[in-house]
Amino acid sequence: MIKLFNTLSKNVEVFKPIDEEVKIYCCGVTVYDLCHLGHARSYIAWDVLRRFLIYSDYKVKFVQNFTDIDDKILKRAKEENSSMKQVSEKNIAEFHKDMDALGIMRPDSMPKATNHICNICSFIKVLEKKGFAYARGGDVYYSVFKNKDYGKLSNQNILEQNINQQGRMTSDESNKKNNPQDFALWKKAKENEPSFDSPWGKGRPGWHIECSAMVKDELGETIDIHLGGADLIFPHHENEIAQSESANNKKLANYWLHNGMVNVNGQKMSKSLKNFTTIRDLLDSGTSPMTLRYFVLTVNYRKPLDFTDEALKSASEAWKTINVALSFFDITKKENLSIEVNETNEFVEEKYKEKINYEISQKKIKFTNALNNDLNTAGAIAIIYELAKPLKNFINQFQRIKNLDINTNEKFHLRETLKTLEELTQVLGLKKEEIIIENKITEEQIISLINKRLIAKKGRDYAEADKIRNSLKEKGIELIDQSTELTTWVRL
């Protein structure tokens, strides 16, 4: 059974869906710029959750919004001498490019705030009618003190928040708000800014109300899972709960899941610290999409993820092992060794077959148990690595010993291991990438250097022999001395 940490209860709970179809809402991006590593961390984690639910035979409807009207978008439009729509559409296209590269499944629906203005206005009218909202001079605010449960997600103290907010209000806000903690549902239009018609005059929606309206319109009044980063717990998700539950008299979501933040070399990632990295910058610098995905999955989604060059390099090396294993058939076919998946198992010894099937079933159970345990991707990755190692080792051995004798039992073991590896990596969204050999060196060049090294050794020029060995290792070639006269090699 799947167990998830619920931010609302502060406990790990058994997941029990409302209906046959699991309804999930994920807070999307404000589309004014390229996505950064924090977005990668969040959307990779939730993509694995979605994939695992599907793997566990659940039907899933996954909705993720776009905030396409916001102060940041308007500011960017002004800087670029463009329009709000042009900025948002451009960055939506860039968002898809990044997410597709990382192997993130596209949501079933991706509503935009600007397409839900009528729904948003209707939602606010309900809150106003019930006494949870009040209009002042073209603005509409939510009255926090009317909601006795406000703060239940974040454990915020309303009175303390009220005091803290008093010094942050503009003079206009202090004249309009009943209390400093009250937040905007509708904002009066400013001169020369895009606006929409509403019962309170021209304006645009507040950030929080957008999600409440879109959740209801896309998924209904109560959903199974609501997702987002830990930075959204307060005020965004707290305010979503307040709005939705006040309007609908129903629980907004049964499970609230939040991912941890990204640090860079132990410091919070931010533009002010100049350690801010976009997904595009990282991929353009040579990091493969699956290396980044693998790196994100090595740490539990709720914990902070510390991004360092060393950690990324380590992830790259580990991913190479898995990627080579996933490329098993491509490599063995190139070397004219046939170990096809559909090859007959007729001549495999029954006891051997039972042994291998049992071992693989145990690995699948461990993999599933890891993800059942609050999406423990690090534990799942460990099982993936266990499956990849024997495949990688066989390739190394095969490249070293060209006429390697392999029996039907061993072929069966390799085929079943690869089939399982492909199945489980798909759950984590890890997919085979082209193997790029840096400083590529041909077989003829390798043999020539091996012969030169043997001559150097015979002449007791061990410094030259070591120099050749180290030079080949830098090019990804490891030498294995079988005897004083025979040296074989393998690509690392």
From Swiss-Prot:
How does the cofactor bind to this protein, according to its record? Binds 1 zinc ion per subunit.
Tell me the superkingdom of the source: Bacteria
Entry's EC annotation: 6.1.1.16
UniProt motif ('HIGH' region) ranges: 29-39
Mind telling me which SUPFAM superfamilies this protein's record contains? Anticodon-binding domain of a subclass of class I aminoacyl-tRNA synthetases (SSF47323), Nucleotidylyl transferase (SSF52374)
Reaction catalysed by this enzyme: tRNA(Cys) + L-cysteine + ATP = L-cysteinyl-tRNA(Cys) + AMP + diphosphate
What's an example Gene Ontology biological process for this entry? Answer: cysteinyl-tRNA aminoacylation
Q: Which residues bind Zn(2+)?
A: 27, 211, 236, 240
GO cellular component annotations, sorted alphabetically? cytosol
Record keywords, A-Z:
Aminoacyl-tRNA synthetase, ATP-binding, Cytoplasm, Ligase, Metal-binding, Nucleotide-binding, Protein biosynthesis, Zinc
Q: Where is this motif: 'KMSKS' region?
A: 268-272
GO terms (molecular function) for this protein are: ATP binding; cysteine-tRNA ligase activity; zinc ion binding
Q: Which SMART domains match?
A: DALR_2
Q: Where in the cell is it found?
A: Cytoplasm
Q: Which prosthetic group or cofactor does it need? A: Zn(2+)
The residues that the entry says bind ATP are 271
Note the InterPro entries from the entry.
Cys-tRNA-ligase, Cys-tRNA-synt_Ia_DALR, Cys-tRNA/MSH_ligase, Rossmann-like_a/b/a_fold, tRNA-synt_1_cat_dom, tRNAsynth_Ia_anticodon-bd
The record's family statement is:
Belongs to the class-I aminoacyl-tRNA synthetase family.
The name of this protein is Cysteine--tRNA ligase
Q: Which organism is it from?
A: Prochlorococcus marinus (strain MIT 9515)
Q: Which gene encodes it?
A: cysS
